[in-house]
Amino acid sequence: MLNEILAQDPNNAFARYGLALEYSNSGKLDHALAEFEKLLSSNPDYAAGYFMAAQTLMKSDRRDEARAMLENGIAAAQRKGDGHAASEMREMLEEIGAEQ
């Protein structure tokens, strides 16, 4: 279903995000990250995409990339005035730092 939506509208952020989550939840992490990359390149202020991409990167033990993703996500959330998303990403960033 999501692939059908994306075939007609490749920039549909909701469908792209949903597909990335499906891949991540099913353990297809490289596919998930590719979808998050597509999502964020066409929707750079989609804050939830950064957060979930960072979580997927952590599942792949790509801590430095997850940190960078969160930093970009915090900036995106601040551009949109989404303090809640920025706060969640700051928390995750602190947790990643504490795990070292």
Positions of the model-derived regions?
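Canonical positions in the second alpha-helix
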Residues: 4-5, 38-39, 73
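Structural marker of alpha-solenoid helical repeat scaffolds
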Residues: 8, 42, 76-80
